Curated annotation (Swiss-Prot):
Residues bound to GTP: 416-423, 463-467, 517-520
Residues covered by region (Disordered): 123-154, 212-278
Residue ranges constituting the tr-type G domain according to the UniProt record: 407-577
Family: Belongs to the TRAFAC class translation factor GTPase superfamily. Classic translation factor GTPase family. IF-2 subfamily.
Region (G4): 517-520
Molecular function in Gene Ontology: GTP binding; GTPase activity; translation initiation factor activity
Name the UniProt record assigns to this protein: Translation initiation factor IF-2
HAMAP family given in the database record: IF_2_B
Main location: cytoplasm
Keywords: Cytoplasm, GTP-binding, Initiation factor, Nucleotide-binding, Protein biosynthesis
Family annotation (Gene3D superfamilies): P-loop containing nucleotide triphosphate hydrolases, Translation factors, Translation initiation factor IF- 2, domain 3
Alphabetized SUPFAM superfamilies for the sequence: Initiation factor IF2/eIF5b, domain 3, P-loop containing nucleoside triphosphate hydrolases, Translation proteins
Task of the protein: One of the essential components for the initiation of protein synthesis. Protects formylmethionyl-tRNA from spontaneous hydrolysis and promotes its binding to the 30S ribosomal subunits. Also involved in the hydrolysis of GTP during the formation of the 70S ribosomal complex.
Amino acid sequence: MVEEKTIRLSQVARKLNVATTTIAAYLLEKGFRVENKPNTKITLEQYKILAEEFADSAMDKEEAAELVIGQSYEKEPKVIAKQQEPIKHVHPKEKQVEIEKISLPVIDAPTIIEHKIIEHKTEEPPILQPELPTEEKEELEVIESPQAPQEELKPELETEVQEQDKEIQQELDDTAKVEQAPITKGPEKIDFSKQGEFKGVTVLGKIELAEKKEPKKFQQVASSDIDKKNKKRPRKRVASETGLPSSGKREEEANRYKPKGKVTNKTPEAPKTAVSEKQIQDQIKSTLAKLGGGKNVASRAKYRREKRSLLAEEQAEERLQAAKDAKKLQVTEFIAASDLASLMGVSINQLLSTCMNLGMLVSINQRLDAEAITIIADEFGYQVAFTDVKTQELEEEEEANPEDLVERAPIVTIMGHVDHGKTSLLDYIRNTQITKTEAGGITQHIGAYEVVTESGKHIAFLDTPGHEAFTAMRARGAKLTDIAIIVIAADDGVRPQTKEAINHAKLAGVPIIIAINKMDKPQANPERVKEELAHLNILVEDWGGKYQSQGVSAISGEGVKELLEKILFEAELLELKANSHKKARGTVIEASLDQGRGYLATIMVQDGNLRIGDVVLAGAYYGKIKAMFDYQGKPVKQAGPSTPMQILGLNGAPQAGDLFRAMNTEKEARDIATQRQQILREQGFRTKTHITLDEIGRRLAIGNFKELNIILKGDVDGSVEALSDSLLKLSTEEIKVTILHKGVGAIVESDILLAAASDAIIIGFQVRPTPPVRKLAEKEGIEIRLYSIIYDAINDIKDAMEGMLAPTIEEIITGSASVREIFKITGTGTVAGCYVTEGYIKKNNSIRVIRDGIVIYTGSIKHLKHFKEEMQQVKTGFECGISITNFNDLKVNDVIEGFEQKEVERKL
């Protein structure tokens, strides 16, 4: 796009000779709002409008600029005076110059003057006839002798003229035509040369009338009064005749200086210079006064009103701009939904419900693209400005050569509800038993595998978790895949996560294949599954729809072969191709921190060829690939399209779902990664909101508001994201869950210090702290909870929230007994003979000793006997003997009260 040319306001003001305030006011009247600042830019259209309005001011400025010619005019008379003297000395040579200058047809004035000179020559030839046959040099000597009296006047002018006389004589001796640029001086020389021949003509100075006094002096000394009169008359005639061909500006200037310079001063030089400078300065001042003060003085009050109105408008604009800025968000493209809600100052539940109304399935930690962010922000009345990371060069795809395109394997994602047999089905296909290695028998990571069919075709499988906490993982799998397989248990039907998986696949625009699993069970009912799918607008081919379906059994292997054939058939229809010769690009599936090797990233190469030693940029991290492993852990040297791979060498753990790309140089990758880290860091600062007075008031109104701070560490980024998403959903009006920090890797010392400073608990998901870290946690009193199953972590935090780690303990009084007698027995201690007055006394219950209404001891029963028989419980109306652990100070009439403590969970 060609940018429209603009002009700064200060430049316009100089060109049009108008103040910037006036320009801003006029543009405002024309409907253009422009700030009254020198650097404000206006368009050419606005400049044309201003040029038409202020054309007079521009013309005034041009006329004022022309006054500078007066300074050059002062110099010209000096030059003319200097020219007169040498011209008289070189009178015979000037005749030759005149003959040469006749060849110049450009200027009319010299031709007219020449005719007049010829007339004078007709009068004087008899006097000069004897001198004509002599050489020119001799004539110069003869002429110099009669002009001796004129040399007496030269000393008066030598101080100003002597140097330039020499220059003019040299120019006349060398050439009279060489310099054509100062054409205006040509006729001047001719005029003054003629004045030198006939002293009446030398006074002509037709162009420069200011110097007519100088020839007068020369005329008085060298000629008679009659000659003077004769010279004055042709002088006026020459001025009138030569005024036509000469420049009009000089004629006007001559007329200006006639009455002022000549009438008042008889001396030619000193008065001229002084008066001309004053005149020029006065005229400049008067002109500038007209230009600068004419309009402003006349409308000074108007301008004051305009300034006040402009100031008020600027203040209103500033207030309006501040209000707009408050509704303008500066975000990166891939920001989490929770961070977006924090920036807009709305609750995450409100944002999620709005997304549901818009037909968008969004989780708390799901990163939103630019379109989704714009739509959501618009619903809440915000404008979005995206911060550019300067990655346009990364988005530019290399032009694919059709010869380099080769067929690639399809990427298939298996999705569905939890416990519907997704991983078991994949186990049968791969002849492995992955489910036995997963904690709790459920998939908690997104796995990437490669399978070779009997026909030799390759298929890349992505196994996604089915638990509701792993919504973001399923969304990433749907975006990454070519074909989606929805696994539904034939005995369970369509479940909530089944619907969610179908919606993810639809939003991603990928083909769907329905796999009805557990067909080997007697209660399997595939027709019911198809009916439920029909209610979701998913019609299988058996019901006249477009979606393929296949009944399978992960135990017996029924229908698995047919399912693979349908996958390959769908892939053929898609005509999947990729270029294996260009630099690799793809998506990060998972990222983890391996204690012995460093950051390990699981990626899916979607295009190009990835090799060891390539510089890779993934999200905000980069690095040179040190090693590559396939899904079985075997080292490989390169990976082509549709190949799942694990790579080592990144300087950090990228987020699951980040795009990766092989870069040309390490410097390029480092620069982009640094920019992204800066933006993410700034984004984190902006999303951290401090408590406000309104929030304090809300918490005081609730009365028992509490906040649960959590530091979350996990083995892979996907699990950390899923667990963080689930925990944030537990927040209520009374209890707020805050994830202070989340990351990939083991629990380290910095996590303990952060927890100690912020009164937080640490949750580790499939990670363990090192012994020094555990000791530091015990020293600081920091609680570390470790989990391997996401269910347990969520449930424990939920329970902790209900009681904030201190469940309510209810005390139930079971009975009481009064002390009737005291017995001291050696080896046993004090035994109280009691009578149960209420309830029952149970040996395992706690008791308290009450004397005169005051509790003096709380403990447990050591022995409880009825007669000599040890009892577990004594009911009302019976006597018993009670001995208390570590307490012998019993007295008659003491009351022994039995009670039990029962923990009651506080419900939210």
